[in-house]
Amino acid sequence: MKLLLTLYNFQHGIGSVGDLLIPFETVLNVSALVIVLTFVFLKISWKQSVLIQKEVIVEQKLPILGKVFGGLILSLLILPGFIGNEEAKTSITPLIIWVFLWIGVPVLGLVFGDIYAKFNPLSLFPSAEEKPSSVWIASGLFLGLTWFELVWRKPGNPTHIGTVFILLLLITTGSRILLSKTSIEVDPLHLLHHLYAKLRFSVSRPVYKNMLENIANLSNFKGMEYFILLMIGTVTYDGLRGTTFWYNLFGSSTLDMGFSTFAFFAINIIIISSYRFACWFALRVSGEQQDLNKVSLLFGHTMLPIAFAYHVTHYLSLLLYESQTILYRLNDPYGVGWNLFGVEEITINYFLTPVGLWGIQVFVTLAGHMLSVILAHDLAIKLFGHHQSDKTQYIFLLITVGLTLQALFVLSVP
């Protein structure tokens, strides 16, 4: 077998700054300038709020084919680790969770909407019909799942993945039955895919307004902004820990699981605290007597494009290259000695040059952060009025520029 790429050994950057066609400092300066100019342009030209909130979540029952496919996916996530003897580099299990469900289906959602909801493997049993109200359970489980992905030493081990999904199945099903929760309230993967489907491309004109409205009408379930911020924080940690800068800063401590756990939570706390401070600052300078928690929840959707940009750029290489191993991994899906397709070896086709891949990542990064600035500006006008909108957004702008530079740093250095 020829496997030129294995999960979690792939570098997200392109190798070194010297590989870039233009100086790295120029990339950072121009990117920051683009975000700031977007902010200035909006202040001059966008004087009224035009985006509305209207989303209503309806818990849908899975179709028969969806249940069959979802059951198959669940079996491939759980059984191989307990009945087979496949390693992570040949098992289908890590490919399904970390490529298929983690990045592949969300990208398809840009065109087809929330596909995951039609086969959700964690929602095979009937769920509550109550209206969703909060996503605290989903947020907690998402934090645990990403800790397993980023801190646990063997996130690709089929047995470990199977154990995690047994726990997820028990917790989500138990919460839906005993606490009368809906799937989107307790299933981190369901909520993740629902959020990314909000960026679905539209053929209706004006295209940009339809996409912005689709994001802006995100339901304000309690805890929603924290889930989105965790999406940003976890990828931020993963990006930084893979750089030589991180190792030079902390040395051999980076190999310790205790330190990694501390750093993982610390970065998420920093992201959340910065966001909360930005909301507090907006209220303070506006003079409005509004509840901080309410404003924090209202601005949650403005961070979604950044979360999506982080996610796509970070895992794009896995989607493009690791997905090519699917037939080999499916050749013996349960690790019991089958030979379904007769595939004995596979070679990865790196059809994009490193600089070409980097260019796509930079474009997606800038586009996501620019969308965030637009959404925040529109909401600021709605809440505080046009004359106050720019002042209330200074900290949000600073955070956006900081996240942009951090993302480009991770993508561009070894």
Where is each model-derived feature located?
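Hydrophobic alpha-helical transmembrane segments
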Residues: 26-32, 125, 219, 259-271, ...
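Long, well-ordered mid-to-C-terminal structural blocks that present hydrophobic/aromatic surfaces
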Residues: 241-327
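Interfacial loop-to-transmembrane junctions
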Residues: 292, 369, 373-400
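Transmembrane-helix bundle segments that line or gate the permeation/cavity pathway
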Residues: 2-210, 217-224, 237-238, 370
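Juxtamembrane inter-helical linkers in multi-pass membrane proteins
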Residues: 121-129, 185-212, 284-298, 328-346, ...
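Hydrophobic alpha-helical transmembrane segments and adjacent short intramembrane/lumenal linkers
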Residues: 303-311, 318-377
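Final/C-terminal transmembrane alpha-helix of multipass membrane proteins
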Residues: 311, 390-414
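Hydrophobic alpha-helical membrane-insertion segments
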Residues: 101, 105-107, 225-236, 302-325, ...
